[in-house]
């Protein structure tokens, strides 16, 4: 599947140009949000926020929602949250198409493990293992990896391929 190759390439090659531990503001984040909204994801900002998360992607079947909670100011963490939650939407589309469990990463496990071990800061790995059930570790590691290594434009391309059919 072309998407798997693109995800692996995005994760592995982008790390050479982006400092993985650095959240960043991207001009194309708004375009990514529009793409998601235009393709069936109900995106809400600062609604039903309780202070326990920056964002969440939820779905029932193909009824999809992304809730973002940037608060009064939008910063690099909020841009990273959009990329992260968009990756979860890609995982959802791919798993529906493949008929695999919703907590299955898009990348094959060997590629994901190699990328996580070489590119995710240990603090992120520890955060995921501390805050998520073990059966969600792989999808959260993948979302964190791409949040840090892929641009909003690259994630938009992956979303288009996985969820729109482009």
Enumerate the language-model features and the residues they cover.
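Bacterial N-terminal signal peptides that target proteins for export
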Residues: 1-8
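Bacterial N-terminal signal peptides
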Residues: 8-17
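Sec/Tat signal peptide C-region and signal peptidase I cleavage site
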Residues: 18-23
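Metalloprotease/metallohydrolase-associated module, dominated by Zn2+-dependent proteases
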Residues: 24-25, 29-44, 102-166
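N-terminal targeting signals for Sec/Tat export/insertion, comprising classic cleavable signal peptides
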Residues: 35-67
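Sequence contexts marking disulfide-bonded cysteines in secreted/extracellular proteins
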Residues: 48-50, 68-70, 92-94, 162-166
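Short pre-active-site segment immediately N-terminal to the catalytic Zn-binding motif
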Residues: 66-82
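Catalytic Zn2+-binding segment of zinc metalloproteases
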Residues: 86-103
């Amino acid at each position: 599947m072309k998407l798997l190759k693109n995800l692996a390439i995005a994760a592995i090659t982008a790390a050479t140009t982006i400092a993985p531990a650095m959240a960043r503001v991207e001009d194309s984040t708004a375009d990514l949000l529009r793409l998601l909204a235009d393709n069936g994801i109900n995106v809400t900002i600062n609604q039903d926020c309780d202070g326990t998360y920056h964002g969440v992607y939820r779905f029932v079947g193909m009824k999809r929602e992304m809730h973002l909670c940037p608060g009064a100011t939008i910063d690099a963490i909020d841009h990273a949250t959009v990329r992260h939650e968009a990756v979860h939407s890609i995982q959802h589309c791919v798993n529906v198409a493949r008929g695999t469990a919703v907590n299955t990463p898009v990348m094959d496990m060997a590629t994901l493990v190699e990328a996580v071990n070489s590119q995710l800061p240990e603090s992120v790995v520890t955060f995921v293992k501390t805050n998520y059930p073990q059966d969600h570790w792989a999808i959260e590691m993948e979302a964190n990896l791409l949040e840090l290594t892929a641009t909003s434009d690259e994630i938009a391309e992956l979303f288009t391929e996985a969820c729109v059919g482009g």
